[in-house]
Amino acid sequence: MATPVDAMPIEIDQGELQTRYLELGDMAIRHARVPAGSDMSPLLQGLPDDRCQSPHWGIILEGSIHIAHADGSVETTRTGEVYHWPAGHTATTDESVVFIEVGPVEQMRQFNEHVRQVFAAAD
């Protein structure tokens, strides 16, 4: 099964922040556009340890993103780099970033449902 990125269902559409999300079997795929100056921490509040609980594997298509891990380490992933971010992370950006990530459905769905609740409460 193949799906064009633009045909993936929109998960988040908040100004310059847009994610598309699709579940395929036991894995989920997210295409994300995150603006410069973003801090994902507020979106993660209420999840265990206020961090994303899904591991992700993916590639940065444009820009860069800083990932803060539960152990206190911070890494920057840049255009053209593939990555694995273990569960227990949050993210910030200095510049806009576009990436595609894959992860297990259960954990990816947890973020999906949580962030929808966060934005619904803000409306």
Protein language model annotation of sequence segments:
Residues H69-G88:
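Short acidic-glycine-tyrosine-enriched beta hairpin
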